[in-house]
Structure formats: structure tokens, C-alpha cells
Amino acid sequence: MAVDTEKDSVQAGSPMETPGSPVDETTEPVVTSKTWIVSMILSCGYGLSFWPIPVVSAIGTMISADMGDPTGYIWTLCKETNPIIGMDYLDHLCFLDLVCFIGHIVVASAKSTNQVIAGLVVSGFGGANCQMAAFALPELLPNKWRHIGVVIADLTVYIAVIIAPVTARYGYELGTWAWNFWGVAIFQGLSFFGLLFLYHPPKHPLGIPYKEAFKSLDYLGAFLFIGGAVPFLMGIVWAGVYDSNDVHVVAPLVVGAAVLVCFALWESFGKLKYPLTPTYVFASSWGRDFTAPVIALGVVNMFYYSSSILWPQMITVFYTNGGADWKYSVILSLPQGFAIFFGAMLLTCFGSKLRHWHWQLTGSVFVMVVFGSLLGIVTPTNKGTMIAFIFLSQAGFGWALYLSIAITQMGVEHKNLGVSGGISGCIRFAAGAVATSIYQTVYSNSLAKYTAIYVPSAAISAGLPESKVTDLMAVVSQGAAAMKSYSPAVVAAAEAALSQAYCKAIFVVAMVSMAFGILGLAACLCCKDVDSKMTNKPTIIRRD
């Protein structure tokens, strides 16, 4: 992709004059001011589309409760839907900013959880496709800056991760939470106009006219993919609400999985002119070019969600008196966002110096997995240690995430960059949805299990009659205020036992996340080094 009016402004003979000209690797590449402006607009469009995620994560449960639907928040966390349909052929990103703009307005004006969910679905559709900025932006720059381009694409996301939880909580407490969406809608609209006037995608490398592209799209494949992915993800969400053997869980999971198998068979044996997921992309170099790094990308994203679930729970349960000290809770939420930014900056500054990209990916994933798994040794008193572990784990995540995206881009030919982006985005967000459901289900089940083990025996030892254990269990998770009818000794014993149950539940989730992390490490070891592709040459095709 490129800014089509920029060609005349590039210095004659510069390394970026034409994509096919020989490139002097000893000369630093020239990138014009318009390219940087468009790069920043692309970054803003993506980051602004991501803003609702940390906002909803911070205050979604409270908003749902205030609107009279305490369980509605479950669906607000499942908004990112990344279609791969035609992303290799239809790639003008300004339209997606407009979609996000509409979604933000719907949420900001919401009077019910259903309207919030509807708005998040709209903005999620646009936002999941806005993540194509991670592919559109780096190809404007020389290949050796590919990892830096991915970091720049997420630059506004860092701001969202760090600031949005703060503005969300303050906005909720002050009754102005909707401005988290009104404000973002304004800037998303400005991003739309910026891309509309300054960014013009080049001709597709396959030379396919838009009319032919629409005719040649794999509509049956798209139908099968959507028809399988939607019920499958619904089943995963229901697993956090119903028992695992309930029809609400089993039926959509089975139907969704069966349809996805049909989708895979259709893509593999359908003899399609332009398949959504070309098999040769996955099979290249026995999967080492693209399949291994995209698996690593999905697992890295899965590991992020374990920390995003465990750390807020630890803050609420152990460090802020059940969330009563919400200002201190906001402060404790900052290390995670700053750590991701720090890891991304380390990649930007040292990636090209260290080279050996596949070993960088392996090392950063190793750091993420080790320190993320060590969150499982939490106690109510080791706050400093946990802050250090969450920072180190998320710094590893920041390095690994953007490097894995860059390596997936390098694993395909330029003509398949849209396919790579669509598949990578689908796997990234689907893995996140699966991980979120697994972690939440494991956490809630483990907490219930260990609460039933530790609390009754502790309370009885403190003098509680066995006949009152059932009544105590009904209110123990609501805090000391709900246990006023019990003696101080019983309350203290019950709270200590409940803290122990929380520690055990967190440990189990940390071990589950470690299992995923080991899978990610195996995928990293299978990746190929892309150093030979890190050249001064940009992967762009300009309009003539």
C-alpha cells in the first residue's frame, strides 16, 4: 500500500523511488513527511477502535448492573469480530473508521445493555478490521523497519491500554462514562477524513479490478466461516454461564466445530480461484514461514488475557479492600500498560541490533510465560513481587506480540499480505476469546471448589456451629459487612480461608496459561529467521 500522490515528492534515485528498482543496502532509506502523517493516522484509527476494550473491561460489569442487566457484561467482552472476507482485495481503511465512528455513537447514547452490545458489535466489526493497520502501515516503510512499523501501528493502542482504564473509572464515578465513547467518536471521525483525503491504496499486486474482486470472492467459504465461528464462540461464552454439559454450551460448540471443518475442507479441496485461506500459505516451508508464527501470535494473545484476568482480581481481592479504594486500584492497573509499551520500545530500539529474529521471539515469549506463570505464587502480602512479575511478563508480551505480527507478514508474498492479515487477525482475536472463556471458567470453578474446602473447616475451627455453615457460605464472598451476624473470630477465619481459596484459584489459572505458553514456545522454535528479508526495500506497489 502507499500514498499515491507521494511519488513525485520522493527524491530521485532514493531507495523508495520504485519497488522494483535495485536498492543500495548501505544507504539509509528516505521516507517522506506525508508517509509519516498517513502512518500516524493509521495508528490513530486502530488505537481509537481499540479504546472500548479497556473501558468495558474496567467498568462493563458496573454499567450492566446500573442498567438492570447484571449478566449483560459477558457479551460486551466478546465484540471483536475480524472477517477475513476479501481483505486481500478490498482494503480502503477509511471506511472502517466510519464504521467504528457509528459504533461509538451507539454506545455513548445507550440506555440499555442491548444497545451497548449492539454498538460494541458495530465498532468491533470496524475495529477488528482496523487492525489491518498493523499490515498496511509497515509496508509503507522499508522492510528492515517492519517490526518498528508494527509498533507504530499500535502506538495509540498503548495510550488506550494505559489511559482508558483510568478515564473509564473516573468517568463512571463522576457519571460521565459515556464521554469515553463520545470523545473517541470525534477523533475516529477525524481519522476517517484524514485517510479519505491522504491515503489511497495502490492497485492490488494481482491486478484484480474491484468489479472482478467482488465477483470472485469466496462467498460460500465466507458463509461457512461465519456460520461456524459465530456459534462456536457463542458456545465458549455460554461455558462461563452454564455447566459444561448444558445444551447451551454443547450444541453451539458441536455445530460450530462441524461447520468450521466443512469450511476447512472447502478451502482445501474446492478448487477456488481466490480462496479465503490458501493452503499454500500454511504449507510454505512445512509451516515454518507462516503457520508457526501465526500459532505463536495466537498463543501470545491468549497469555495476555490470563494476566488481564488475574491481575485485576488480585488488585480487588488483596490490595484494595474488595475494590473499595478504587483510586488506588486505578494506580495499580498502570504497570501492565506501561510494561507493554516498554516491551514494544525495546523491540523498536534493539530489534535490528540483535537480529536473529526467531530467537528474539522465542526469548520474549519465554520471559512472558515464566513471569506470567509465577503470578500463581501470589499471597495477600507479596504485592511488590507480583507487580514486578506482571511488569516483566507484560514487557515480554509487548516485545513478542509485535515481533510475531512482523514475522507473519514476512512469511508470505506481498500479494498475500491481506490474506496474512485477515488470518492473523482472526486467529489472534479468536484465541483471545477462547482463552478468556477458559480462564474465567477455570477461575470460577476453582474458586468455588477451594472455597468449599477451606472456609467451612476454618469457620468451624473458629467456633461456628456446623448448622450455620451453609448460611455463611452464602455471604462469605460479599465481605465483612455481609457477615456482621457472626463473631469477629469466625469472620476473620472465613476471610483468611477465602483469601487462601483465591490464591489457589489464581494458581490453577496460571498453570493453565503456562500450558498454552509452552505450546507457544514450541511454535517459536519452529519459526524461520527472517533477517534476509529485513532490507531497505519497501513492500509497496504504487499507482502510476
Curated annotation (Swiss-Prot):
Which SUPFAM superfamilies does the annotation name?
MFS general substrate transporter (SSF103473)
Gene3D superfamilies, per this entry?
Answer: MFS general substrate transporter like domains (1.20.1250.20)
One GO cellular-component annotation of the UniProt record comes to:
plasma membrane
Q: Where are the transmembrane segments?
A: 36-56, 90-110, 116-136, 148-168, 178-198, 221-241, 249-269, 290-310, 330-350, 361-381, 387-407, 418-438, 505-525
Where is it localised?
Cell membrane
Q: Could you name the domain of life of the organism this protein comes from?
A: Eukaryota
Keyword tRNA processing: yes or no?
no
**Where is the segment annotated Disordered?**
1-28
Q: What is this entry's stated membrane topology?
A: Multi-pass membrane protein
GO molecular-function term, one example from the UniProt record: transmembrane transporter activity
InterPro entries per the record? MFS_Str1/Tri12-like, MFS_trans_sf
Which one Pfam family would you cite for this protein? TRI12
UniProt key word Secreted: no
Induction statement: Expression and the subsequent production of PR-toxin take place under static culture conditions (oxygen limited), whereas no expression of the PR-toxin genes occurs under the strongly aerated conditions required for optimal penicillin production. There is a negative control of the transcription of the PR-toxin genes by the penicillin biosynthesis gene product(s), or by a regulatory peptide encoded by a small ORF inside the penicillin gene cluster.
Q: Which UniProt keywords apply?
A: Cell membrane, Membrane, Transmembrane, Transmembrane helix, Transport
Q: What is stated as this protein's family in its record?
A: Belongs to the major facilitator superfamily.
Functional summary from the UniProt entry: MFS-type transporter; part of the gene cluster that mediates the biosynthesis of PR-toxin, a bicyclic sesquiterpene belonging to the eremophilane class and acting as a mycotoxin.
Put simply, this protein is called: MFS-type transporter prx5
Gene name per UniProt: prx5
